[in-house]
Amino acid sequence: MKEFIVNAINYDKKIVTTAIESGADYIIIPEDKEEEAKKLGRVNFIIADKKGNLTDDFVIVTIKNKQDEEKAAQLAKAGKKVIVRTTDWTIIPLENLIAQSENIYAEVKNADEASIAVGILEKGVKGVVLETEDLNEIKRVASVIKETTEKVELIRAKVTAIIPVGMGDRVAVDTTSLFKRGEGMLVGNSSAGMILVHAETEESPYVASRPFRVNAGAVHMYTRVPGGKTVYLCELEAGKEVMAYDIDGNGRAVVVGRAKIERRPMLLIEAEYNGKKLSAVLQNAETIRVVGGDGSLISVVDLKEGDEILGYVEEAGRHFGMKVEETILEK
């Protein structure tokens, strides 16, 4: 997930409080206000001394010319967290810096600039630094940074097999967020081919809805987490983040509140898209739903061969959850 920093160097209690309530990752404050600020909430503070030096390896570089840009690049490569300040905010210096290092932060004035910064060269800056006196602008930028963090292209795959595979351990992922209708998690036996499993937002004759939950499937399966990485479902636990996606492929990070592993009857679902195989092992229960090619919700007990379902495929393999270009065959 991108990092959100609020610059409160001109200390204002309301600014700091709003930043904390909006989920800021860091707040920049003057050193003489450190003790006062810490009483307002638990958050990471970057302390600025009277000369403007920052703690936690952060450094501000004002870009006026090519030499300044080269200085920023060198500092970032040396491990410094470089906050880029431009006299005339443009994309080009950030493009050049992002191409050379991941330790680049952009100083922004509003949500529009933040949205551009996090999307530059597709991967965007590591975070944004907002300086404003507008409390609502803090909330707007927080929404940009914390909500939609990834966009993937979902495909329509044709179901080729639905096979009962007996009992297995499955993971129900309870998050600290409420899912909307049309949202769920991407899971798969292989990270190269995943199926969109819908959240439990729908009412059922047998059980009440659980709109904070995705019954995600067997413990061995992959799911996506922020940063374009994958983890095994069994690795999810309270406090960790996982990606939620809607039917258009818009992703947002949500926090895991609890991961329940229980033994249940399971189904192997296999599908195909342009010769590529997607598969997942899901619980055999009426409340478990995948998403049809038209956006409809289909219970796994009603799923049939030939049905179209939404999924995701990628070419690269995975090494410790990171995408790599190498030959990997998973069956």
Swiss-Prot record:
Protein name: 3-dehydroquinate synthase homolog
Keyword Signal: no
Gene Ontology biological process terms, A to Z: amino acid biosynthetic process; aromatic amino acid family biosynthetic process
Keyword annotations from UniProtKB, A to Z: Amino-acid biosynthesis, Aromatic amino acid biosynthesis, NAD, Oxidoreductase
Domain of life: Bacteria
GO MF, one annotated term: 3-dehydroquinate synthase activity
One matching Pfam family: DHQS
Catalytic class of the enzyme: oxidoreductase
HAMAP family in UniProt: Arch_DHQ_synthase
Family label: Belongs to the archaeal-type DHQ synthase family.
Classification via NCBIfam families: PRK02290.1-5
EC number from the UniProt entry: 1.4.1.-
